[in-house]
Amino acid sequence: MAEAADAATLTRKYKYFYETECPDLDHLRSLSVANRWLETEFPLADDAKDVARLSGAELEFYRFLFAFLSAADDLVNVNLGDLSELFTQKDILHYYIEQESIEVVHSRVYSAIQLLLFRNDAVARAGYVEGALGDPAVRRKVDWLERRVAAAESVAEKYVLMILIEGIFFSSSFAAIAYLRTHNLFVVTCQTNDLISRDEAVHTAASCCIFDNYLGGERPPPARIYELFREAWKLSASLFGCAPRGSHILDVEAISAYVEYSADRLLAAIQLPPLFGTPPPGTDFPLALMTAEKHTNFFERRSTNYTGTVINDL
């Protein structure tokens, strides 16, 4: 087991060459590299025609949702830099470099979709996003994260928070976007959503892996972990209090059940019993499960209706 990651970690002897020290993280990095993609490969402008097909309440909800995702993605990027500095194992450092690279793509995709939802009115988009970040549902999540990170008594607790951001906060949003596909809306946006959700599955798996194997056995008490999971679940549910009532697109109940299932799956990944006991979603659930377990190539389900060329498409 590796030494605990703390301020003293960086004082260990640094190796000026590469050798495999963390084969599990090396595998996840290789999986991510093999499935790199760029925002320029997807003609998001093709979805512009669908903006008018949303009701006023649905359009407001998806504008709000993408404002939240963009803000949350930036918070993850800030935390990545802090976490990567805690380790000297090059497999972990290389993995985080790869994750930061794909997070840039996610950020650019979210920005393009936001602009699409405002019919390319950049001024309106900027004003809306600034206001949305002050919305109580978003503010509670951001404040909770900042407060919990500041109060975290250990690196292990910070990793629990990362697992919750990537595995709980994001998963409900990805599911809400995936429901657009069931009505043949925003087809290209849904393609990018599939890829982003798969990327985040790898990122969550990496956080669980580091938590389990590279923190020197340091773990918060189970009661503390369950407390954080309950809080994250409650906050995720509150965000969907903004969902339009009577929408023919969204199934909020199914999304809520999916979040509970995701929480139980993440608890299993860090060697803890389930909290909710919720079964996996049915085959009619529109989002491919956020899991990296099959280690398949992410592009196997990818449509060819985009610009650019996929190289090394296994």
Swiss-Prot record:
The chain crosses the membrane at residues 160-180. PROSITE patterns: RIBORED_SMALL. GO terms for cellular component: host cell membrane; membrane. Its cofactor is Fe cation. SUPFAM superfamilies: Ferritin-like. Fe cation 1 binds at residues 73, 103, 106. It is a single-pass membrane protein. Pfam families: Ribonuc_red_sm. Keywords: DNA replication, Host membrane, Iron, Membrane, Metal-binding, Oxidoreductase, Transmembrane, Transmembrane helix, Viral latency, Viral reactivation from latency. GO terms for molecular function: metal ion binding; ribonucleoside-diphosphate reductase activity, thioredoxin disulfide as acceptor. Fe cation 2 binds at residues 103, 166, 200, 203. The keyword Transmembrane helix applies. Belongs to the ribonucleoside diphosphate reductase small chain family. Ribonucleoside-diphosphate reductase holoenzyme provides the precursors necessary for viral DNA synthesis. Allows virus growth in non-dividing cells, as well as reactivation from latency in infected hosts. Catalyzes the biosynthesis of deoxyribonucleotides from the corresponding ribonucleotides. Heterotetramer composed of a homodimer of the large subunit (R1) and a homodimer of the small subunit (R2). Larger multisubunit protein complex are also active, composed of (R1)n(R2)n. This is Ribonucleoside-diphosphate reductase small subunit. It comes from Bovine herpesvirus 1.1 (strain Cooper).
